[in-house]
């Protein structure tokens, strides 16, 4: 396995792919049909669920449970955006927006893994955190959700 080097070509390339996905996937689907929007939402939901399942398996079965505890804010943001995509309730978008973007963005740039690409933990980290921000971007671009200053107190 390769040690994680933040300025390595592979890490910068993966970060570029993550950021491009976050920006361009919702823009590409913006003017599509409602059925296509729904399919994209279910794709994001699937990414989040598979990532959380892999995380549970890796930390709960292969490693020790205590390595997965306490739950990180990104775990709550994952489930928040997942619930938003299923129900379209604004409160879940607000939580994912204010607590998900900063944490997930930092984790994409500086992952909490000892190894870089192609380690499974690294790939899982990048996909999971990209899915959080992709879900928030979906809500903003396709569902026209917007955070307002008054929403800070609600988060």
Model-derived regions, located:
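Hydrophobic transmembrane alpha-helical segments in integral membrane proteins
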Residues: 1-19
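Membrane-interface helix caps and helix-loop-helix hairpins in membrane proteins
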Residues: 57-65, 87-90, 111-123
């Amino acid at each position: 396995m390769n040690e994680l080097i933040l300025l390595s070509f592979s890490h910068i390339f993966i970060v570029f792919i993550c950021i491009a996905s976050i920006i361009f996937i919702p823009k590409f689907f913006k003017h599509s049909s409602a059925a296509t929007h729904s399919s994209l939402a279910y794709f994001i939901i699937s990414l989040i669920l598979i990532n959380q399942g892999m995380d549970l398996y890796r930390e709960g079965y292969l490693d020790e449970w205590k390595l997965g505890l306490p739950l990180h804010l990104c775990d709550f943001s994952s489930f928040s955006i997942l619930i938003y995509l299923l129900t379209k309730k604004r409160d879940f978008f607000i939580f994912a927006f204010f607590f998900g973007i900063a944490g997930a963005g930092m984790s994409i740039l500086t992952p909490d893994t000892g190894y870089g690409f192609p380690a499974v933990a690294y790939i899982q980290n990048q996909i999971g955190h990209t899915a959080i921000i992709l879900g928030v971007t979906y809500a903003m671009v396709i569902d026209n959700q917007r955070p307002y200053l008054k929403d800070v107190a609600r988060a």
